[in-house]
Amino acid sequence: MAKSYGAIFLLTLIVLFMLQTMVMASSGSNVKWSQKRYGPGSLKRTQCPSECDRRCKKTQYHKACITFCNKCCRKCLCVPPGYYGNKQVCSCYNNWKTQEGGPKCP
C-alpha cells in the first residue's frame, strides 16, 4: 500500500514538473519586440555606433562584430535587440547574406 502511494506521488510530481516546463516554454516564446524601436529605419546613422556597441558588448570577436554591425546598420538603419539572435525584427539585417549564403550581419 505504501509503495502505491509513493508511486502515485512520484507520478504526480513528474506531471507537475512537465506542466510547469510547458507553461514556461510557451510564455518565453511570445516575446515580441517593437518594430518602431528595432525595425528597419528605426535608427539614424548617428545612432549606429552606440547600438552596435550594445549589440557587440559580450562577443568574443568585438572588433569584427563592431565593423560588420556598423556596416549593416548604415545600410538597414536598424540593429536587432539583445546581444545575439532576434534578427527577424530587422528584416534587412536578417536577409543580407554573404556570397556563400551565411549571415553578413552579427
UniProtKB/Swiss-Prot annotation:
- Signals that turn on the gene: By gibberellins.
Q: How is it modified after translation?
A: Six disulfide bonds may be present.
Q: Upon deletion of the gene, what happens?
A: Increased number of axillary inflorescence shoots and decreased seed weight.
Q: Which GO terms describe its cellular component?
A: extracellular region
This protein's source sits in the domain of life called Eukaryota
Keywords from the named record: Disulfide bond, Gibberellin signaling pathway, Secreted, Signal
Q: Which InterPro entries does UniProt cross-reference here?
A: GASA
Supply the PANTHER family for this chain.
Answer: EXTENSIN, PROLINE-RICH PROTEIN (PTHR23201), GIBBERELLIN-REGULATED PROTEIN 4 (PTHR23201:SF124)
Please give the function described in this protein's UniProt entry.
Gibberellin-regulated protein involved in the regulation of floral meristem and floral organ identity, and promotion of seed size and weight. May play a role in the promotion of gibberellin responses such as regulation of flowering under short-day conditions, seed germination and inhibition of gibberellin oxidase. Possesses redox activity in E.coli and may function in redox regulation in planta.
> What family is reported?
Belongs to the GASA family.
Q: What is this protein called?
A: Gibberellin-regulated protein 4
The gene designation is: GASA4
